[in-house]
Amino acid sequence: MLNPSIDSLLQKIDSKYTLVTVAAKRAREMQLANNCVVEQPVSHKCVGKALEEIDAEVLSYVPSEDKVAE
């Protein structure tokens, strides 16, 4: 079972495609800098840690003005 759950993650970011993009971008940043903001991450992989950051509301997404205007 996925921890955090997809349902709790989709309450933070409304689109699963945006969720994947944000988590992947943050995971790449973590691979380069090796910095996780969550104190005791459950996952040992960067993507899992990024999802935990989103679930803890440490990492969020603000849509760009171009996407809002459409």
UniProtKB/Swiss-Prot annotation:
Annotated GO MF terms: DNA binding; DNA-directed RNA polymerase activity
Catalytic activity, as annotated: RNA(n) + a ribonucleoside 5'-triphosphate = RNA(n+1) + diphosphate
Keyword Transcription: yes
Record-annotated membrane-spanning stretches: none
InterPro entries: DNA-dir_RNA_pol_omega, Pol_omega/Rpo6/RPB6, RPB6/omega-like_sf
Complexes and interactors: The RNAP catalytic core consists of 2 alpha, 1 beta, 1 beta' and 1 omega subunit. When a sigma factor is associated with the core the holoenzyme is formed, which can initiate transcription.
Name under which the protein is recorded: DNA-directed RNA polymerase subunit omega
GO terms of biological process kind: DNA-templated transcription
Keywords: DNA-directed RNA polymerase, Nucleotidyltransferase, Transcription, Transferase
EC number(s) stated in the UniProt entry for this protein: 2.7.7.6
Annotated PANTHER family: DNA-DIRECTED RNA POLYMERASE SUBUNIT OMEGA
Enzyme class at the top of the EC tree: transferase
Superkingdom of origin organism: Bacteria
Keyword presence, Transferase: yes
Family: Belongs to the RNA polymerase subunit omega family.
Summary of the function given for this chain in its UniProt record: Promotes RNA polymerase assembly. Latches the N- and C-terminal regions of the beta' subunit thereby facilitating its interaction with the beta and alpha subunits.
GO cellular component annotations of the record: DNA-directed RNA polymerase complex
SUPFAM superfamilies, per the entry: RPB6/omega subunit-like
Native organism: Bacillus cereus (strain G9842)
